[in-house]
Amino acid sequence: MSDVINIENATKVIKDRTVLDGISLELPRGGVYGFMGINGSGKTMLFRAVAGLIHLSSGSVSVFGRRIGKDCDFPPNLGLSLDSTGFWEDQSALWNLAFLASIRGEVGEPAARDALRRVGLDPDDARKVSAFSMGMRQRLSIAQAVMELPELLILDEPTNALDADGIGMVARLIFEERARGCTVLVSCHGEPQVEALFDRTYRLYEGRLADGRR
Protein backbone atom coordinates (compact mmCIF):
# COMPACT_ATOMS: atom_id res chain seq x y z
CA MET A 1 0.00 0.00 0.00
CA SER A 2 1.25 3.46 -0.90
CA ASP A 3 2.36 5.73 1.91
CA VAL A 4 1.43 9.00 0.22
CA ILE A 5 -1.56 11.15 -0.59
CA ASN A 6 -1.25 11.76 -4.31
CA ILE A 7 -3.13 14.67 -5.86
CA GLU A 8 -2.70 14.74 -9.62
CA ASN A 9 -3.85 17.68 -11.76
CA ALA A 10 -6.89 18.25 -9.53
CA THR A 11 -9.29 20.56 -11.37
CA LYS A 12 -12.81 21.60 -10.44
CA VAL A 13 -15.04 23.89 -12.49
CA ILE A 14 -18.32 25.19 -11.08
CA LYS A 15 -20.58 27.26 -13.34
CA ASP A 16 -17.71 28.28 -15.64
CA ARG A 17 -15.53 29.23 -12.66
CA THR A 18 -12.37 27.24 -12.07
CA VAL A 19 -12.10 26.77 -8.31
CA LEU A 20 -9.27 24.22 -8.47
CA ASP A 21 -6.81 24.64 -11.32
CA GLY A 22 -4.49 21.70 -11.96
CA ILE A 23 -3.15 21.13 -8.45
CA SER A 24 -0.60 18.31 -8.10
CA LEU A 25 0.90 17.31 -4.74
CA GLU A 26 2.49 14.30 -3.09
CA LEU A 27 2.12 14.24 0.69
CA PRO A 28 3.94 11.44 2.56
CA ARG A 29 2.14 9.63 5.36
CA GLY A 30 2.61 10.92 8.90
CA GLY A 31 3.33 14.57 8.11
CA VAL A 32 1.53 17.79 9.01
CA TYR A 33 0.77 19.85 5.91
CA GLY A 34 -0.38 23.45 6.11
CA PHE A 35 -2.46 25.17 3.45
CA MET A 36 -2.69 28.93 3.43
CA GLY A 37 -4.40 31.50 1.26
CA ILE A 38 -7.15 34.10 1.32
CA ASN A 39 -10.80 33.06 1.48
CA GLY A 40 -11.83 31.64 -1.88
CA SER A 41 -8.32 30.54 -2.82
CA GLY A 42 -9.34 26.88 -3.03
CA LYS A 43 -8.29 25.44 0.34
CA THR A 44 -11.69 24.14 1.36
CA MET A 45 -12.45 22.81 -2.12
CA LEU A 46 -9.14 20.92 -2.14
CA PHE A 47 -9.91 19.42 1.26
CA ARG A 48 -13.36 18.38 0.03
CA ALA A 49 -11.75 16.66 -2.95
CA VAL A 50 -9.35 14.72 -0.72
CA ALA A 51 -12.26 13.77 1.56
CA GLY A 52 -14.33 12.50 -1.38
CA LEU A 53 -17.06 15.09 -0.87
CA ILE A 54 -16.86 16.48 -4.42
CA HIS A 55 -16.19 14.97 -7.82
CA LEU A 56 -13.31 16.58 -9.69
CA SER A 57 -13.88 17.87 -13.22
CA SER A 58 -10.54 16.28 -14.10
CA GLY A 59 -7.53 14.84 -12.30
CA SER A 60 -7.46 12.42 -9.40
CA VAL A 61 -6.86 12.00 -5.67
CA SER A 62 -5.41 8.82 -4.17
CA VAL A 63 -5.09 8.36 -0.42
CA PHE A 64 -2.54 5.76 0.66
CA GLY A 65 -2.95 3.78 -2.54
CA ARG A 66 -6.72 4.01 -2.88
CA ARG A 67 -8.14 6.25 -5.59
CA ILE A 68 -11.07 8.33 -4.36
CA GLY A 69 -14.17 7.74 -6.49
CA LYS A 70 -12.78 4.52 -7.95
CA ASP A 71 -11.39 2.25 -5.22
CA CYS A 72 -13.45 3.93 -2.50
CA ASP A 73 -15.91 6.79 -2.12
CA PHE A 74 -14.15 8.26 0.90
CA PRO A 75 -10.72 7.78 2.47
CA PRO A 76 -10.86 5.03 5.10
CA ASN A 77 -10.46 6.13 8.71
CA LEU A 78 -10.91 9.84 7.96
CA GLY A 79 -11.35 12.56 10.56
CA LEU A 80 -12.86 15.72 9.10
CA SER A 81 -13.62 19.17 10.50
CA LEU A 82 -14.84 21.51 7.77
CA ASP A 83 -17.28 23.67 9.73
CA SER A 84 -19.10 23.85 13.05
CA THR A 85 -22.57 22.93 11.79
CA GLY A 86 -24.38 19.66 11.17
CA PHE A 87 -25.01 18.70 14.78
CA TRP A 88 -28.33 17.87 16.43
CA GLU A 89 -29.08 21.27 17.95
CA ASP A 90 -31.54 20.04 20.58
CA GLN A 91 -29.09 17.54 22.08
CA SER A 92 -25.94 17.81 24.19
CA ALA A 93 -22.39 17.60 22.88
CA LEU A 94 -21.94 14.17 24.49
CA TRP A 95 -25.16 12.86 22.92
CA ASN A 96 -24.06 14.10 19.49
CA LEU A 97 -20.65 12.47 19.60
CA ALA A 98 -21.83 9.25 21.25
CA PHE A 99 -24.50 8.86 18.59
CA LEU A 100 -22.03 9.50 15.76
CA ALA A 101 -19.61 6.98 17.26
CA SER A 102 -22.32 4.34 17.65
CA ILE A 103 -23.53 4.55 14.04
CA ARG A 104 -19.93 4.24 12.85
CA GLY A 105 -19.54 1.01 14.80
CA GLU A 106 -17.47 2.44 17.65
CA VAL A 107 -18.02 2.22 21.39
CA GLY A 108 -20.03 5.40 21.72
CA GLU A 109 -19.83 7.18 25.05
CA PRO A 110 -16.26 6.42 26.19
CA ALA A 111 -14.80 7.61 22.87
CA ALA A 112 -17.05 10.68 22.92
CA ARG A 113 -16.06 11.63 26.47
CA ASP A 114 -12.37 11.33 25.69
CA ALA A 115 -12.68 13.45 22.54
CA LEU A 116 -14.59 16.19 24.35
CA ARG A 117 -11.97 16.35 27.10
CA ARG A 118 -9.19 16.62 24.50
CA VAL A 119 -10.72 19.80 23.07
CA GLY A 120 -11.53 21.34 26.44
CA LEU A 121 -15.28 20.65 26.58
CA ASP A 122 -16.99 19.17 29.64
CA PRO A 123 -18.56 15.80 28.72
CA ASP A 124 -21.16 16.30 31.45
CA ASP A 125 -22.32 19.70 30.17
CA ALA A 126 -26.03 19.05 29.59
CA ARG A 127 -26.66 22.19 27.58
CA LYS A 128 -28.05 21.79 24.09
CA VAL A 129 -25.68 22.52 21.22
CA SER A 130 -28.03 25.34 20.21
CA ALA A 131 -26.81 27.21 23.33
CA PHE A 132 -23.12 26.87 22.41
CA SER A 133 -20.94 29.81 21.42
CA MET A 134 -19.13 29.73 18.08
CA GLY A 135 -15.92 28.80 19.87
CA MET A 136 -17.59 25.86 21.62
CA ARG A 137 -19.08 24.71 18.33
CA GLN A 138 -15.63 24.80 16.76
CA ARG A 139 -14.24 22.69 19.59
CA LEU A 140 -17.10 20.22 19.12
CA SER A 141 -16.39 19.96 15.39
CA ILE A 142 -12.74 19.19 16.12
CA ALA A 143 -13.74 16.64 18.77
CA GLN A 144 -15.84 14.64 16.32
CA ALA A 145 -12.95 14.69 13.84
CA VAL A 146 -10.44 13.15 16.27
CA MET A 147 -12.86 10.91 18.18
CA GLU A 148 -12.04 7.72 16.27
CA LEU A 149 -8.26 8.26 16.12
CA PRO A 150 -8.17 8.76 12.34
CA GLU A 151 -5.43 7.80 9.94
CA LEU A 152 -6.00 11.04 8.00
CA LEU A 153 -7.16 14.20 9.77
CA ILE A 154 -8.39 17.24 7.81
CA LEU A 155 -8.89 20.48 9.75
CA ASP A 156 -10.22 23.43 7.76
CA GLU A 157 -9.46 26.65 9.65
CA PRO A 158 -9.77 24.96 13.06
CA THR A 159 -8.78 28.11 14.96
CA ASN A 160 -11.76 30.15 13.73
CA ALA A 161 -13.69 31.66 16.65
CA LEU A 162 -11.15 30.36 19.18
CA ASP A 163 -9.32 32.39 21.81
CA ALA A 164 -5.65 31.99 22.70
CA ASP A 165 -6.40 28.96 24.87
CA GLY A 166 -8.32 27.37 22.02
CA ILE A 167 -5.52 27.98 19.54
CA GLY A 168 -3.12 26.33 21.97
CA MET A 169 -5.49 23.36 22.19
CA VAL A 170 -5.45 23.00 18.39
CA ALA A 171 -1.65 23.09 18.32
CA ARG A 172 -1.40 20.49 21.09
CA LEU A 173 -3.91 18.23 19.38
CA ILE A 174 -2.08 18.39 16.03
CA PHE A 175 1.17 17.55 17.83
CA GLU A 176 -0.46 14.56 19.53
CA GLU A 177 -2.02 13.29 16.30
CA ARG A 178 1.27 13.47 14.44
CA ALA A 179 3.04 11.68 17.31
CA ARG A 180 0.78 8.65 16.87
CA GLY A 181 1.37 8.60 13.08
CA CYS A 182 -1.70 10.43 11.80
CA THR A 183 -1.37 12.49 8.61
CA VAL A 184 -2.78 15.99 9.15
CA LEU A 185 -3.96 18.53 6.58
CA VAL A 186 -4.77 21.92 8.10
CA SER A 187 -5.55 25.42 6.88
CA CYS A 188 -5.16 28.52 9.00
CA HIS A 189 -4.54 32.24 8.90
CA GLY A 190 -1.29 33.18 10.58
CA GLU A 191 -1.31 31.37 13.94
CA PRO A 192 2.41 30.83 14.77
CA GLN A 193 1.70 28.05 17.30
CA VAL A 194 -0.03 26.00 14.62
CA GLU A 195 2.24 26.93 11.71
CA ALA A 196 5.31 25.87 13.71
CA LEU A 197 4.07 22.27 13.45
CA PHE A 198 3.85 22.22 9.65
CA ASP A 199 6.31 19.93 7.91
CA ARG A 200 5.53 21.79 4.72
CA THR A 201 3.40 24.81 3.87
CA TYR A 202 1.50 25.29 0.62
CA ARG A 203 -0.04 28.54 -0.56
CA LEU A 204 -3.07 28.63 -2.81
CA TYR A 205 -4.22 31.53 -4.96
CA GLU A 206 -7.27 31.49 -7.23
CA GLY A 207 -7.39 27.71 -7.19
CA ARG A 208 -3.74 27.27 -8.08
CA LEU A 209 -0.75 26.16 -6.05
CA ALA A 210 1.33 29.30 -5.57
CA ASP A 211 4.33 27.77 -3.80
CA GLY A 212 5.44 25.31 -1.17
CA ARG A 213 8.18 25.79 1.38
CA ARG A 214 9.93 23.69 3.96
Residue ranges and their predicted role:
Residues 36-38:
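The feature captures the beta-strand-to-loop junction immediately N-terminal to the Walker
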Residues 51:
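Helix-to-loop junction immediately C-terminal to a conserved catalytic motif
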Residues 59-74:
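Conserved ABC transporter NBD signature motif
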Residues 98, 109-124:
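Conserved ABC ATPase "signature" region
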Residues 153-157:
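Catalytic Walker B motif of ABC-type/P-loop ATPase nucleotide-binding domains
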Residues 188-189:
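H-loop/switch region of ABC-family ATPase nucleotide-binding domains
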